[in-house]
From Swiss-Prot:
Function comment: Involved in the gluconeogenesis. Catalyzes the conversion of oxaloacetate (OAA) to phosphoenolpyruvate (PEP) through direct phosphoryl transfer between the nucleoside triphosphate and OAA.
Keywords, comma-separated and alphabetical: ATP-binding, Cytoplasm, Decarboxylase, Gluconeogenesis, Lyase, Manganese, Metal-binding, Nucleotide-binding
Gene Ontology BP term (one): gluconeogenesis
Protein name (Swiss-Prot/TrEMBL): Phosphoenolpyruvate carboxykinase (ATP)
GO CC terms: cytosol
Organism classification: Bacteria, Pseudomonadati, Pseudomonadota, Gammaproteobacteria, Alteromonadales
This protein's encoding gene: pckA
Reaction equations catalysed: oxaloacetate + ATP = phosphoenolpyruvate + ADP + CO2
Cofactor(s) required, per the database record: Mn(2+)
EC primary class: lyase
GO molecular function: ATP binding; metal ion binding; phosphoenolpyruvate carboxykinase (ATP) activity
PANTHER family the record matches: PHOSPHOENOLPYRUVATE CARBOXYKINASE (ATP), PHOSPHOENOLPYRUVATE CARBOXYKINASE ATP
């Protein structure tokens, strides 16, 4: 029997423990008539329950802390050393925060959900979630790997997450913290604390940050990417920041989905960390994304969507947030890798970027050094929405296409990834799903044809030319791309000089961003693989 004595975590006099509740019980619990506020779920006409998370409709990166002690002092990439969210916390302040959460959870009826993070038995984390809110228990049951009955019998957690969303920290100013809310980690005690924020994603991304700490130290790549596998067993991984196409491009009727967001790569191959998907639902339609739409049914959990009095969901309504979401168990998608979300070694590594500057080609093949350079740069760009004319694009450089979730220095992830790629003989490509000189976004049809050419290997037969300034190898034509002129971004401009001006501007931004990596010999050597001014 698993040890359910919560007093070892500081939680006392518990009224009742609802341990590993079924989906049916969770449905009953989260829709009870006597619930109020953010605890109460609404049944929608799609069968899924919808909940609200209040003002917290996304993560709170400024409220993220890691205890700086003997375990972490020399390993964590601290916020005072780089642009990231790993703010140090003293053990003394940690103990005060822990006291707040354990006091909040004591004397209550609690939900305890035991899960795994990581599909590989050798390196997975056994994670126990403790919460007083039924839908939060539902969220982690969806998102993490659900152990078998046999595994649950002897379950002993490696890591514990205590979610005290209802409690806040009144001493935050005195403790020199960011606000009354907190998401804090102690890697010695192996505990995560959540206070003040109701956003479900804090539990998901919290454990991703922990996998990002433990795995690279063991030589295993930990990646913010989606992954799929073809009928011949050929694996592809898709790195990219939010909005670049990770979920859309990896959901392919010809290929089985391994996972849509978080993966590891070890001696056996690529494996999912999760047991579910957390998909954006803004402007979702059955026609454009049938797989995701059809996954929204009983046992799925909608967040911050608009629901009318009849339970009808309006996916186009962004009045609460643009970041409307749904979590569902991965088996709600038909074409997935079964029974375990893992496959062999990746042969194709695809970096997705949405370049709003109109400079980068739709696809370029990268050398080993360029792959490291662009992985460390993690570039994408956003366009502020205007009705006509191109506004100033905003560049985003997020190391490893996921700086917010990195616990170690970015170069450690790059080194591990490159070793895995070399051992597998994997090729790397930079795919731009953004804009070109026409002012329009590259069509999803053209991007899918490019992805097909990468995955079936036909891109290797193409003739390549070099793009100036960036020294990227671009194919001159590809099967399925009807207008091959789009493959060279220069040809999409009426005035050749305009591309050149934009390219120099973007190149300068790349160079300035990469300066922070030139404090190591490896980083200095990679400068030559980036844009040249």
């Amino acid at each position: 029997m698993p040890n359910l004595d919560l007093s070892r975590y500081g939680i006392t006099d518990v009224e009742e423990i609802v341990h590993n509740p079924s989906y049916d019980l969770l449905f009953e619990e989260e829709t009870r008539d006597d619930l109020q506020g953010y605890e109460k779920g609404t049944v929608t006409d799609l069968g899924a329950v919808a909940v609200d998370t209040g003002i917290f409709t996304g993560r709170s990166p400024k409220d993220k802390y890691i205890v700086r002690d003997d375990t972490t002092r020399d390993t964590v990439w601290w916020a005072d050393q780089g642009k990231n969210d790993n703010k140090p916390l003293s053990t003394e302040t940690w103990n005060e925060l822990k006291g707040l959460v354990t006091e909040q959870l004591s004397h209550k009826r609690l939900f305890v959900v035991d899960t795994y993070c990581g599909a590989n038995e050798d390196t997975r984390l056994a994670v126990r979630f403790i919460t007083e809110v039924a839908w939060q228990a539902h969220f982690v049951k969806n998102m993490f790997i659900r152990p078998s009955e046999e595994e649950l019998e002897n379950f002993e957690p490696d890591f514990v997450v205590m979610n005290g969303a209802k409690c806040i920290n009144p001493k935050w100013q005195e403790q020199e913290l960011n606000s009354e809310n907190f998401v804090a980690f102690n890697l010695t005690e192996k505990i995560q604390l959540i206070g003040g924020t109701w956003y479900g994603g804090e539990m998901k991304k919290g454990m991703f940050s922990m996998m990002n700490y433990f795995l690279p130290l063991k030589g295993i790549a930990s990646m913010h990417c989606s992954a799929n596998v073809g009928q011949e067993g050929d694996v592809a991984v898709f790195f990219g920041l939010s909005g670049t196409g990770k979920t859309t491009l990896s959901t392919d009727p010809k290929r089985a989905l391994i996972g849509d967001d978080e993966h590891g790569w070890d001696d056996d191959g690529v494996f999912n960390f999760e047991g579910g998907c957390y998909a954006k639902t803004i402007n979702l339609s059955k026609e454009a994304e049938p797989d995701i739409y059809n996954a929204i049914r009983r046992d799925a959990l909608l967040e911050n969507v608009a629901v009318d009095d009849n339970g009808v969901v309006d996916f186009d309504d962004n009045s609460k947030t643009e970041n409307t979401r749904v979590s569902y168990p991965i088996y709600h998608i038909d074409n997935i890798v079964k029974p375990v979300s893992k496959a062999g070694h990746a042969k194709k590594v695809i970096f997705l970027t949405a370049d709003a500057f109109g400079v980068l080609p739709p696809v370029s093949k990268l050398t080993k050094e360029q792959a490291q350079y662009h992985f460390l740069s993690g570039f994408t760009a956003k366009l502020a929405g205007t009705e006509r004319g191109v506004t100033e694009p905003t560049p985003t450089f997020s190391s490893c296409f996921g700086a917010a979730f990195l616990s170690l220095h970015p170069t450690q992830y790059a080194e591990v990834l490159v070793k895995r790629m070399e051992a597998a003989g994997a090729e790397a490509y930079l795919v731009n799903t953004g804009w070109n000189g026409t002012g329009k976004r590259i069509s999803i049809k053209a991007t899918r044809a490019i992805i097909d050419a990468i995955l079936d290997g036909s891109i290797e037969d193409a003739e390549f030319v070099q793009l100036p300034h960036f020294n990227l190898a671009m194919p001159t034509e590809l099967a399925g791309v009807e207008d091959s002129s789009i493959l060279d971004p220069r040809k999409t401009y009426e005035d050749d000089g305009e591309w050149d001006v934009r390219a120099k501007d973007l190149a300068e931004r790349f160079v300035a961003n990469f300066e922070k990596f030139t404090d190591t010999d490896n980083g200095k050597a990679l400068v030559a693989a980036g844009p040249q001014l």
